[in-house]
Design a protein with these regions (language model features):
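Short, compositionally biased
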Residues: 136-147
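Short beta->alpha transition motifs characteristic of CBS
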Residues: 52-57, 127, 137, 162, ...
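Short loop/turn motifs at secondary-structure junctions and domain boundaries
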Residues: 31-34, 158-162
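A residue-level detector for short acidic-glycine micro-motifs
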Residues: 44, 84-86, 143, 171, ...
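N-terminal targeting leaders that route proteins to membranes or the secretory/organellar pathways
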Residues: 1-22, 27
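Catalytic nucleophile loop of clan PA
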Residues: 41-42, 160-180
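Short, conserved catalytic or interaction motifs in soluble domains
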Residues: 89, 128, 146, 167, ...
């Protein structure tokens, strides 16, 4: 869809991980299927979100757990109607959309440009490693040229475990610069 995601024309200033987690955490979700779970993040307020293809591959029942801010607290809500909009097995990406006419507008995150990242830049991930939702891990970019199975990857020292797959890797400007995976 047109206007599916936003890219900041002028990058915002860098901030602390603590500030950014408070700002961005609501846009990160847990993706559940009968055979497992992963992470994801909203691109738009209307419920379009990204996860990894391998998280939802072959699944027909996909539930998205979202954490809404309510009176200074985070409230978990499961959305049972998630439609697959697009999938790319080679890129290991899937675009989903929550189909719930009563859903509120969702917090979403901007995409950044991973080409401007440099080795040594600080990055962090938010996800659900081992099912532990809303876990934050931090590290640095180790290399931008890691090739595996015909694909180019960003490699980071940020701790990534099963369940992080599909979640965002952020720079310190609060922009998504990668989608965590390593199946």
């Amino acid at each position: 869809p047109k206007g599916l995601y936003t890219i900041n024309p002028t990058p915002p200033p860098e901030r602390t991980v603590r500030e950014l987690v408070t700002q961005l955490g609501e846009a990160v979700v847990q993706v559940r299927t009968p055979s497992g779970l992963g992470s994801g993040f909203f691109l738009r307020e209307d419920g379009h979100l990204i996860t990894n293809f391998h998280v939802i591959e072959g699944e027909t029942q996909i539930s998205i757990e979202v954490y809404h801010q309510r009176n200074g607290q985070l409230e978990r809500r499961a959305y049972k109607q998630a439609r697959i909009i697009a999938m790319n097995k080679f890129a290991d990406l899937a675009l989903l959309k929550i189909e719930d006419k009563d859903a509120p507008k969702f917090a979403h995150v901007p995409l950044g440009d991973s080409d401007v990242l440099a080795v040594g830049d600080r990055v962090f991930a938010i996800g659900s490693p081992l099912g532990l939702e809303r876990t934050v891990t931090e590290g640095i970019l180790s290399t931008k040229t890691r090739q595996m199975q015909g694909s180019l990857y960003l490699q980071t020292t940020t701790q990534i475990n099963p369940g992080n797959s599909g979640g965002p890797l952020f720079n310190l400007r609060g922009e998504v610069v990668g989608v965590t995976n390593m199946k």
